[in-house]
From Swiss-Prot:
The modification Phosphoserine is found at S15, S430, S747, S748. It is an enzyme of class 2 (transferase). It comes from Ovis aries. This is Glycogen phosphorylase, muscle form. The record marks C109, C143 as: Involved in the association of subunits. The modification Phosphotyrosine is found at Y204, Y227, Y473. It comes from the Eukaryota.
């Protein structure tokens, strides 16, 4: 007789291996049915379209979880160096279609839903965007997660699970109105709450100095509960984790100092603690020094570092003890990437843990911290740099302020030794800024506490070394690197533009999807008539589809044969939507002046959100809508010119508009846009670019050849010269008749007859304090736009230029960006090796 199984042997039956999902249509239908009835508890008589979306989402999720568990088991067994990407924003968008693409499930799901009498595209439209970001910085983090999984890195994204993401934008009477984005209202099928990993985060209190060292006591505690979202790589069976923290009040919150009748109030006050993860701050490239925002920044850092250290200590490898207690190996096992200065408190927090709790000597703790952390800078705009008032940090994080002071003292000692007698340099480089309000410069903290500092495009990284971080570069030149941004070709080509992905695959195969440099092979098809025809046909289909979408959603009719001229990005003075407006009015005035002349028809679309407190950005939106009201209702113009403001621009709208674009507007003042990533998405999707030599535009023009790019305007050096000379808008107003006419129209109320002075703030800014020199580039911009129209009249030549752009966009894959971070900052090697599938033996 066989002996009875031990408990451990019995438990071996609990394995993911026996549960591997079969990825065929019959099984998918069966699972869809099971989830509709058993998970959602609905039958077909009462199921809504949203129920069908959820059933499909859960069905697809089933194919993720086996791989997810397997991947995490693999990391535990092999103990690779872990990469921790810390960001206050992850602008994910929708997850369903991206998951199907990366798991190669799309065709089977399409067929299964079709057989069930459902339309998969309609179901995909039901999903809410996860709008946990403002713009480029948050979307970059999402693209990076996709690439890290695709390159087999043991990577984790850490951030905040905001209950309300970026606001929904409604246009009412031409003005932006904000509505709360209640994206979790119906639940989120992609996240898994992990209450068992809840961690305490401390605020306020005071510091006690004991014989054992400093102790942070009498603190208020807020709990951080993690929610995990799977991040699948492209067809390699790797599924990484994005862990977002949600704030919860502890059970004894406000009850310790219980007073009679205070119980109900204490329970109601739990909201105050939980407000930490309530809402994303809607500022892009602007610092707002609010206490709640500082709490958010520390909250994500404190919870994440506890998690990182727990995982480091409980690893299978590295020492004979059941847990690691020695931190010498920490930088060999952990890399922390700071996405801008928002998570910069990771540096003093890691020091606090190592010195106060793990009892390391300061020098050793500092060595570990610097080797572990790296910092990415995203902007040179002074108003965007984080400078926290000392009094705020002192109240909220008293121990961290002491640590920052100590870091500063030791850092300035090094500076003084390297540059004896240079007192002004000490002032410039200090982490502490003296003034009416004493502040901590978080960028300086990040540079001092990191082993690598990078900009996000070549020109931006050079500007950092020559200007805002010049002193730091002179002290430690080895720290400074460039990592030009990229985008994931899975979402931004295969998923959003399947027609184009298909005609490319027909010529060069599918390998380019995980190796975008292969697009170069398309250069041999620049004169291939059938390829030219196919590319043009896909673009026309995308334009028709987007026209139908605009008609259905916004009741606006546009001419699909017109040139689609598109500028979509956050509304900000430096991005110069106003320059675009001046060109539109120029075109309008020219049509009115010579109504019988032939004009290349254009549909100009501008979209983007303005920060709720940014008056000028909101006025810019009002101007765009006012221009549209005049232009679109003028019978003389007809369909030769249309101006559309795209309401509520977000990831899911970008996926529709970018594949339909003919012309991409990337027109920031040279030296202001760190990189840009929208520019790359347009290039990959077959639009031509009109742009300044700024950010990644410089490298895009270099890759494609300047002759395949519409470049105009001042270079960085020209802007500097103009600054030295003094920019005088009046000179341009006096010299350029068309420009003068436009400004006079704006001043006289031509575009706002009911409120003639509506745009006086815009005119006043443009004429008297325009930091971004719109007039200086006006003439060249208009001339460059004339070249665009001339080329558009020759469809074959236009499409050949499009093909050259697509073929040279390979550099701008986030896979390339992440491979460079991996090798040059994190010290790990990317791989395209497949992980075994859940049903395969390891």
């Amino acid at each position: 007789m066989s002996r009875p199984l031990t408990d451990q042997e019995k438990r071996k039956q609990i394995s993911v291996r026996g549960l591997a999902g079969v990825e065929n249509v019959t099984e998918l239908k069966k699972n869809f049915n099971r989830h509709l009835h058993f998970t959602l508890v609905k039958d077909r008589n009462v199921a809504t379209p949203r129920d069908y979306y959820f059933a499909l989402a859960y069905t697809v999720r089933d194919h993720l979880v086996g791989r997810w568990i397997r991947t995490q088991q693999h990391y535990y067994e092999k103990d690779p160096k872990r990469i921790y990407y810390l960001s206050l924003e992850f602008y994910i968008g929708r997850t369903l279609q991206n998951t199907m693409v990366n798991l190669a499930l799309e065709n089977a799901c399409d067929e299964a839903t079709y057989q069930l009498g459902l339309d998969m595209e309609e179901l995909e439209e039901i999903e809410e965007d996860a709008g946990l970001g403002n713009g480029g910085l948050g979307r970059l983090a999402a693209c990076f997660l996709d690439s890290m999984a695709t390159l087999g890195l043991a990577a984790y994204g850490y951030g905040i699970r905001y209950e309300f993401g970026i606001f929904n934008q409604k246009i009412s009477g031409g003005w932006q109105m904000e509505e709360a984005d209640d994206w979790l209202r119906y639940g989120n099928p992609w996240e898994k709450a992990r209450p068992e990993f809840t961690l305490p985060v401390h605020f306020y209190g005071r510091v006690e100095h004991t014989s054992q060292g400093a102790k942070w006591v009498d603190t208020q505690v807020v709990l951080a509960m993690p929610y995990d979202t799977p991040v699948p790589g492209y067809r390699n069976n790797v599924v990484n984790t994005m862990r977002l923290w949600s704030a919860k009040a502890p059970n004894d919150f406000n009850l310790k100092d219980f007073n009679v009748g205070g119980y109900i109030q204490a329970v109601l006050d739990r909201n105050l603690a939980e407000n930490i993860s309530r809402v994303l701050y809607p500022n892009d490239n602007f610092f707002e020094g609010k206490e709640l925002r500082l709490k958010q920044e520390y909250f994500v850092v404190a919870a994440t570092l506890q998690d990182i250290i727990r995982r480091f200590k409980s690893s299978k490898f590295g020492c004979l003890d059941p847990v690691r207690t020695n931190f010498d190996a920490f930088p060999d096992k952990v890399a922390i990437q700071l996405n801008d200065t928002h998570p910069s408190l990771a540096i003093p927090e890691l020091m606090r843990i190592l010195v106060d709790q793990e009892r390391l000597e300061w020098e050793k703790a500092w060595e570990v911290t610097v080797k572990t952390c790296a910092y990415t800078n995203h902007t040179v705009l002074p108003e965007a740099l984080e400078r926290w008032p000392v009094h705020l940090i002192e109240t909220l994080l008293p121990r961290h302020l002491q640590i920052i002071y100590e870091i500063n003292q030791r850092f300035l000692n090094r500076v003084a030794a390297a540059f004896p007698g240079d007192v002004d340099r000490l002032r410039r480089m200090s982490l502490v800024e003296e003034g009416a309000v004493k502040r901590i410069n978080m960028a300086h903290l990040c540079i001092a506490g990191s082993h690598a500092v990078n900009g996000v495009a070549r020109i931006h990284s050079e500007i950092l070394k020559k200007t805002i971080f010049k002193d730091f570069y002179e002290l430690e030149p080895h720290k400074f690197q460039n990592k030009t941004n990229g985008i994931t070709p899975r979402r931004w080509l295969v998923m959003c533009n399947p027609g184009l992905a298909e005609v490319i695959a027909e010529r060069i195969g599918e390998e380019y999807i995980a190796d975008l440099d292969q697009l170069r092979k398309l250069l041999s098809y620049v004169d291939d008539e059938s390829f030219i025809r196919d590319v043009a046909k896909v673009k026309q289909e995308n334009k028709l589809k987007f026209s139908a979408y605009l008609e259905k959603e916004y009741k606006v009719h546009i001419n699909p044969n017109s040139l689609f001229d598109i500028q979509v990005k956050r509304i900000h003075e430096y991005k110069r939507q106003l320059l675009n407006c001046l060109h539109v009015i120029t075109l309008y005035n020219r049509i009115k002046k010579e109504p019988n002349k032939f004009f290349v028809p254009r549909t100009v679309m501008i979209g983007g959100k303005a920060a709720p407190g940014y008056h000028m950005a909101k006025m810019i939106i009002r101007l765009i809508t006012a221009i549209g009201d005049v232009v679109n209702h003028d019978p003389v113009v007809g369909d030769r010119l249309r101006v559309i403001f795209l309401e509520n621009y977000r990831v899911s709208l970008a996926e529709k508009v970018i594949p339909a674009a003919d012309l991409s507007e990337q027109i920031s003042t040279a030296g202001t846009e760190a990189s840009g990533t929208g520019n790359m998405k347009f290039m990959l999707n077959g639009a031509l670019t009109i742009g300044t030599m700024d950010g990644a535009n410089v490298e895009m023009a270099e890759e494609a050849g300047e002759e395949n790019f519409f470049i105009f305007g001042m270079r960085v050096e020209d802007v500097e010269r103009l600054d030295q000379k003094g920019y005088n808008a009046q000179e341009y107003y006096d010299r350029i008749p068309e420009l003068r006419h436009i400004i006079d129209q704006l001043s006289s109320g031509f575009f706002s007859p009911k409120q003639p002075d509506l745009f006086k703030d815009i005119v006043n800014m443009l004429m008297h304090h325009d930091r971004f020199k719109v007039f200086a580039d006006y003439e060249e911009y208009v001339k460059c736009q004339e070249r665009v129209s001339a080329l558009y009249k020759n469809p074959r030549e236009w499409t050949r230029m499009v093909i050259r752009n697509i073929a040279t966009s390979g550099k701008f894959s986030s896979d390339r960006t992440i491979a460079q971070y991996a090798r040059e900052i994190w010290g790990v090697e990317p791989t395209r090796q497949r992980m075994p599938a859940p049903d395969e033996k390891i």
